Regions:
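N-terminal intrinsically disordered/low-complexity leader segments
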Residues: 1-13, 201
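Helix-turn-helix
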Residues: 13, 17, 21-58, 62
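Short amphipathic alpha-helical elements of helix-turn-helix/winged-helix folds
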Residues: 21-25, 139, 169
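Short, basic, alpha-helical segments at the C-terminal edge of helix-turn-helix-like DNA-binding modules
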Residues: 35, 65-71
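Hydrophobic alpha-helical connector segments
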Residues: 62-65, 75-109, 159-166
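Amphipathic alpha-helical segments used for helix-helix packing
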Residues: 89-90, 103-127
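Short, solvent-exposed amphipathic helices
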Residues: 107, 128-135, 139-142
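Hydrophobic/aromatic-rich alpha-helical bundle segments in the mid-to-C-terminal region
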Residues: 126-130, 134, 148-201
């Protein structure tokens, strides 16, 4: 039992290190980043990479899936940090949103744009991740609906529509803020919060 547990932990650690390296390479070099570079950065062989993921497409999609889950977890934490909608401070909310993508928001946004380009250029991959994308929207919409209800507000538009807009625009706000040197998070959140009203009777 101990041997099996150790083997499983070792495989899990290998997978995590490979994903970390792949995320760095894909964000800095795009999908064109080579498997050799990823394996070297992780300190493993290409054989270990293939054993874990089977190929480049599967590795890239695994990186994106992990990144999306981090975003969802972070969003849930942001929503949980407020008790009432009336007490939501836009500046504080904007700061939390700014940190939502992690320590390197620009890299995270670049990775998401690379993923979008990958799907546009690879219809087969788009079909493979369609269910994952729907689940991301569904999960985010659920967080939004439950969070707004808990805060004592109501949505003026469907939660799923707002979720799609957030996913579609968040990376653009991040990159534009970085490239233009102007913080757009506050303005962005003012637009988002305009879709929230008082509780329904």
């Amino acid at each position: 039992m101990t041997e099996r547990w150790t083997r499983e932990r070792r495989m899990e650690q290998t997978r995590t290190v490979l994903l970390d390296a792949a995320e760095t390479i894909f964000a800095s070099r795009g999908y064109a980043g080579s498997l050799e570079d990823i394996a070297d950065a992780a300190g493993y062989t290409r054989g270990a990479l293939y054993a874990q993921f089977g190929g480049k497409d599967a590795l890239f999609l695994a990186v994106i899936e992990r990144h999306r889950q981090r975003f969802l977890d972070g969003f849930a934490d942001v929503m949980a940090s407020f008790d009432r909608f009336a007490d939501v401070d836009v500046e504080g909310f904007a700061e939390r949103w700014r940190l939502l993508s992690g320590a390197d928001a620009q890299r995270a946004a670049a990775l998401n744009y690379e993923f979008t380009l990958f799907l546009l250029r690879n219809p087969d991959a788009r079909d493979r991740v369609a269910a994952q994308r729907r689940e991301t929207v569904r999960s985010l919409a659920e967080y939004i609906a439950k969070g707004i209800a808990r805060l004592g507000g109501s949505l003026k538009i469907p939660a799923e529509s707002l979720a799609r807009v957030l996913l579609a625009t968040n990376d653009g706000v991040t990159l534009a803020s970085h490239l233009d040197g102007e913080d757009l998070y506050r303005t962005f959140l003012q637009l988002v919060l305009s879709s929230v009203g008082p509780p329904e009777d």
